[in-house]
């Protein structure tokens, strides 16, 4: 019973498969008769024999699309359902073909019309020739062409001979080995590049030149035969007493004077200057400045690197170490120091520069004088100043800035062009031991072109420096960057902020210094590290300026200082003082201050003399002749008491000295 059921199932499967194939073939014939042929006639296709029309499977990867001959979806009069169902199908009155190739095994299908010999692509051209027996060339692929019905080429499975198999493991290992070799070769070339460069340079310098007498000398050396042996010959050797007129080379040859090869002379000259190569006498080379400096510690860092303290021949120096990526900035600042006649007491003194190999990296050193007090920013963090010190600091800074801005004429080798610093701030101003200042960090400075007709200085990327100290015309991009004086006006604005910072740390009478941590321009309205947009809003849109101490308006000196500061930070660049005018104004105020102090001292001395005449000398009541200790003279006591009484009666409620003449007030602080 079970056997009958199994046989029945097998017969049902076979019958179902045959029925399914018959249904598909009949559906295809109905599609050709009722839809495809009418659509082709509507499309006015006349080169096809409609009585032999059948369908074939076509491969999309070789062009089964609108370019393929007889592509069914390319017929515009068919509906979308038929186009989608017959997407990978073509029609033909000729042959269906299948091609297969090994390694990797790929099969392609398509149509070839009876009257067509070629197609648009090379593949179809080959198929047309194969199916029409028009080629005798051997092919690496296997072809099948048939015309017995719909999709006839799909019925045959092409069995290809197995090709040579390559292990993927060996392929991966081969690739890895090749990559490893390339990497090692690159590392070896990188590590030995200096040696190869030196050898190449040696070859270029000492390669034999055409017409070199070396070969002629070798060819013209007389030969003598030693013994009876044939071919045993050596050059004739001159007597010892005649060898004084020859020069011996490292190769053992001798050449009479005047005919030594030029390249040999060059080689001997180089060998005589060797520093220990083993091919000549050892000579000592002078150490560069980098080899004579001993670094003792880092003192700060900046935009292009860090600053260290060093010892150079017993003198303390500052060494600015540039990063390797900032070599253009190093060369620019070095070139400015070396070629611009920048010897001025209020400009940081340049000592030298060098390239130092530390064994790991190559460092770029710029050596300047060292000031233990550090920058003005650091100095104000630790100290307060009085009016005298304020004038010393700011007047010297203005003097250095005026020196940079002014042009000094001279010969071509000894003239200084007008310059703009472009990064004036308290961190770039050094405080010297005499409480004067020196301007440093000239890496962003700009020189006026020597050609007067060329008035362009920099490109449009002129917004450089510290954002907090940028002038309004730079923040709002209205600066005339082709006019050199515009950069100097921007320097004056930055200098006014430095003057304000220093004034905030000034202490005199009732005027107390501001907290050091808050002495930062615009800190009330900006972050510690503001962006361009934030500074633009504060300085240009809202037109704010750093806040003033209300007591400054009543101070005899600070009110004049604020007048200078307000003029220098004016929003209109043309309304600002020049750096030279700033220096002149502070010179005048400082001189008036010194005159007041001298006049006050003179008046005090005059009062003491007058009192001495009126009171006369008096003996102290406790005078004891028997006492051997030095006696105190009564007139000295009276002088001190009178000075103290004068000071007490002269003080006003605000702590200032009162007088009808302001110039009689002594210097406070």
Curated annotation (Swiss-Prot):
Span of domain GS: 262-292
UniProt note on tissues of expression: Head and ventral nerve cord from embryos to adults. Expressed in many sensory neurons. Subset of head neurons show coexpression with daf-4 when dauer/nondauer decision is made. Also expressed in non-neuronal cells: membraneous sheath surrounding the distal end of the intestine and in the distal tip cell of the gonad.
Start and end residues of each stretch annotated as Disordered: 611-669
Any one GO molecular function term: activin binding
Listed name of the protein: Cell surface receptor daf-1
UniProt-annotated catalytic positions: 423
Intracellular or extracellular location(s): Membrane
Record-annotated Protein kinase domain positions: 293-593
Range of residues in the leader sequence: 1-19
Extracellular side of membrane: 20-170
Gene Ontology annotations for the cellular component aspect, listed alphabetically: activin receptor complex; plasma membrane
Annotated residues for binding of ATP: 299-307, 320
Reactions catalysed, as given in the entry: L-threonyl-[receptor-protein] + ATP = O-phospho-L-threonyl-[receptor-protein] + ADP + H(+); L-seryl-[receptor-protein] + ATP = O-phospho-L-seryl-[receptor-protein] + ADP + H(+)
Keywords, alphabetical: ATP-binding, Developmental protein, Glycoprotein, Kinase, Membrane, Nucleotide-binding, Receptor, Serine/threonine-protein kinase, Signal, Transferase, Transmembrane, Transmembrane helix
Feature: compositional bias, Polar residues: 651-661
Annotated phenotype, changing residue 70 to R: In allele p168; forms many dauer larvae
One Pfam family named in its UniProt record: PK_Tyr_Ser-Thr
EC number(s) given by UniProt: 2.7.11.30
